[in-house]
Amino acid sequence: MAVPVIETNNIISHPEGGCPLQVGEGTYHLKDNLHLATPPPHPSEAPIVNPNPLATVPTPPTMGVKLSLICISPRTKTPSSLPNQTVVAPPFGDGNPALAPVPVKDGLKRRKPKNNIIKSSSSFVSRVITHEAATKRLNDRSPEGLFAFANINRAFQWLDLSSKQKEEPLTKILFTKAHMLCHDTNELTKSSSHIDIVMGSSAGDIIWYEPMSQKYARINKNGVVSNSPVTHIKWIPGSENLFMAAHANGQLAVYDKEKEDALFTPEIQNQSAEALKASGRQPLQVLKSVNSRNQKTNPVALWKLANQRISHFAFSPDQRHLAVVLEDGSLRVMDYLKEEVLDIFRSYYGGLICVCWSPDGKYIVTGGQDDLLTIWSLPERKIVARCQGHNSWVSAVAFDPWRCDERTYRFGSVGDDCRLLLWDFSVGMLHRPKVYQASARQRTSMITSNTQYGNRHRADSASNRMRSDSQKTANTYESCDQAVRHPVEPRARTALLPPIMSKVVGSDPICWLGFQEDCIMTSSLEGHIRTWDRPREGISDKYNDQSSSPAISASATGSGSVSGLADSNTGLS
């Protein structure tokens, strides 16, 4: 007997006066709560009845709801504190003739995937549901409106958040068994008739999807390059075709959306026995270089960072550096154009989960299983402060570019404790703990100012210093020895930053956070997409850092009581 198909619908609610966010510049009011419908399991998938919590059988990886937002014609550009660059980073793979763009006959016309997802006979796609008035809705909408793409279990939805019927998806794709864990839109190729999206699945397969034409292509099909789940995926800045995907087996791969797949064999035949033996301890093992002349098929490049899961990565605003966080508790800063790891930092304990860059590229913020956020300085290559306020794992962190200027930075974080926290910091606000200051006065040596690496906290012994003074060679394995492994900075010597706002915003873990010009958005494990309107005052004005500057706790014990939190109302009314 056939299993009946159960249709589920999204639900939107408009709480009145519920869950306001009180900050120095005003009150953020909860506009709406869009609850995405969780699709039932595919009929061919056997339900798990009374699972044994002690079972060692691995379960399919899942993620909470993540959003990819895109606006075809935004009214204003996202503000950036990045100074005018005199030197622009070259494109990834620049100098390799095998990656030179091939001129096309169609000129500026965007290439689309070849297969129609609605008429697809692939067993990978279960069914596609399109809105009956999708064409009319697209024609009538403003190009300034916001599109959102969201994953929830085996479903992937295309939403128009500027529509009065925002709860009704333009398209809902149901996959057979695979869950889409991550996705990203290409800002460079977007137009009123074209949007490029890549999404990574729990099966390792990657989908290149163009929603306007409902065309798609399958990349890394059946795990031909890597059969490990895709944990994070992003388009490479400035590229129309190339995107980077992190796999759960510790591999970072660069794919071309228009290249075919082929059975992958690591290109390590030219490496010496000593290099192969040493590769296990090195922070980057190049299985295929972007400089390889073999570029007829995917991947364009493939790197092995560790045997543990890569949780997240983020590109720097100058499009040269890559910050990668792993389940082994490390933050690795790469010059991905040169395929080199520059620095390796460690968490206080536990794995790292999320990472982001400040708009000016000077700071990196990470969050992890130690319930802390950590601010790292890229120019100084050191920790700046630890941020204490979460009661569980930190799942996402993001800067608010509309609240950042040359002196003050605003960022937010969400976690498994169902909380949304907002943070303000400036370098002048941070003070070293008294214990550290006393010991610092006894130092007789002066830190030289003619090097940006003078403030690095690193051991002096040769065994802990991985940076070599010998001349670099072209061998990628040998260049990996240049990475500096920084020791963990004791909590007693690290400034502690409290949040300016802490709020429980739901009853299930929050897993994504985004800032827009007029709102703050979050999404949760069970599919709640919440939107808070910003205060009505002009948000384009320069931020007055005196409006909500918290007192900085830098207790030598590291406990650091966090005071002044707007947390009196932790419930949802």
Swiss-Prot record:
UniProt cross-references to PROSITE patterns, sorted A to Z: WD_REPEATS_2, WD_REPEATS_REGION
Cellular component terms per the entry's GO annotation: cell division site; cell tip; nucleus
A Pfam family the protein falls into: WD40
Comp. bias (Polar residues): 461-479
Alphabetized Gene3D superfamilies for the sequence: YVTN repeat-like/Quinoprotein amine dehydrogenase
Keywords annotated in UniProt: Repeat, Transcription, Transcription regulation, Ubl conjugation pathway, WD repeat
GO biological process: carbon catabolite repression of transcription
Positions of the UniProt region annotated as Disordered: 448-481, 537-573
Keyword Repeat: yes
Biased composition (Low complexity): 547-564
Role: Component of the regulatory network controlling carbon source utilization through ubiquitination and deubiquitination involving creA, creB, creC, creD and acrB. Required to prevent the proteolysis of the CreB deubiquitinating enzyme in the absence of carbon catabolite repression. CreB deubiquitinating enzyme stabilized in a complex with the CreC leads to the expression of genes such as those in the proline and quinate pathways.
Family statement: Belongs to the WD repeat creC family.
Name the UniProt record assigns to this protein: Probable catabolite repression protein creC
Lineage summary: Eukaryota, Fungi, Dikarya, Ascomycota, Pezizomycotina
